[in-house]
Amino acid sequence: MMSTLISIVCIAVFFCLNILGMMHMLPLYITSPLLFLSILFTLYRLNHRKTFKGF
């Protein structure tokens, strides 16, 4: 539960940074991969929770 909350906060922060990048206040080539990695981490954590680990 805590990692889900952290990842949602990271998405919100990196989304705001990406908006600043689109306004040319920050480099877009830095903010876009950060947003992508935070979304990727969130989806990985949400999908990997209920996998079958074997007997």
Swiss-Prot record:
It comes from the Bacteria. It is a multi-pass membrane protein. The chain crosses the membrane at residues 5-25, 26-46. The lineage of its organism: Bacteria, Bacillati, Bacillota, Bacilli, Bacillales. This is Uncharacterized membrane protein YizD. Keywords: Cell membrane, Membrane, Transmembrane, Transmembrane helix. It comes from Bacillus subtilis (strain 168). GO terms for cellular component: plasma membrane. The keyword Cell membrane applies. Its main location: membrane. It is found in: Cell membrane.
